[in-house]
């Protein structure tokens, strides 16, 4: 989908939208110098926003800015003030919810003027559609110091939901509020509708205006936007026409790769399972680091192969927030295991906060946990366990959740269901003793994290515009297969007489797992 629009024969490119803010200029930097550098760096549309000056000064600044914008063939819009826009023949206006109504502004402005409005929720989007505006400014997507916010933060997942409503319209959408080079890729990947509609641009004040080098700041934002546009349409899908044989071969190869790579797998997990998760990691040929302090997350994010965030006893939320942010920044897979998320309001709110802060590569849970995450009441949970027979159509459910959260979703149970939003895989391995020991679900999360680390580390092709390289669907399938096949082999051993002997045997079978065993025992079906 093109990020530009044709109005009055003019092509409007919203990809990098500068909103001015003279009060944020660094000491010694002149406003016009900063504006020209940002235009050189790739700003494609400018809005003059002056909140605390009189009319004469607003008009002067707008006219001086217009000369530069004309030089770079960039449209100029005026924030709030129709009179200023008319007086200087601006290309259009940006209106807030309490400014001049769109229908009246349209009557006053010359035909073909660009009209954009601020939207903070779905109702405002619906009104903007009725008003046939040219674009919407959705915000604030993150917290910002540039302006005191009077409406709730939308967050990236909220932007995606609002974009769903713009499907089938010609209205363009930019996000605004707290966007900077360090969160831009995350912002873009998170802000996509379930049908794949992405943002047409980003509107930025401080990351450009506050920079001593606005040319470089703008160029960096432009580059990230372009790389995102050039990347594959979903963040993790590799778009291979998956077949059971292909997946089996990939899972087997990943096991061999991981024994060579020996990735470091960081796990923020719960005390109940920490020991057995670390042992499972080692048994597969990876190295565990069970680190949860926020202060160490940045350093670790450079050296880890993947990060597992397991909710379990949820004491380390700050570490989880910071860890996921840095993992995204350094393009390391994040595996999210929202243990017992349906159990309390605190857990539900924490899951939302985490998923609004970083993007998971894989979300893994049982039917009850994933239902709670998706705010579906089709399946109920009791504590950390799922209750009842599960979803009527589990394949459809995981596919939809994968599209909404833009990641791979793994739903564990007697049958495991995995989807990247395009393909749905059904796995039928596993022994019922897994349900009788504590932490087997958490160990699945660990195994998925181990194999996703291998998938990311051994990825042949890297796309700058993706949050993570490598085939996360195959990584997730391989992780589930490893534990479930090992459970079948362990349960069949003559030295296993109950749950007490099953757990060490399970670790043994993970240790002795081979590519040939995966090929021999994996029960895989591609169902959609
Ligand atoms: C692109 C874009 N989106 C939103 C806004 C916010 O406008 P508004 O709601 O009018 O608030 P103020 O900017 O007037 O504080 C914007 N300016 N640009
Ligand atoms: C002007 C403005 N409008 C917002 C909204 O939410 O409508 S947020 C915002 C400020 C954006 O500045 P920065 O890029 O420095 O965070």
Tell where the protein language model's regions lie, with residue ranges.
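Charged helix-capping and loop-helix junction motifs
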Residues: 31-33, 59-63, 150-160, 218, ...
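Conserved phosphate/ATP/ADP-binding segment of small-molecule kinases
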Residues: 59-132, 346-426, 430-433
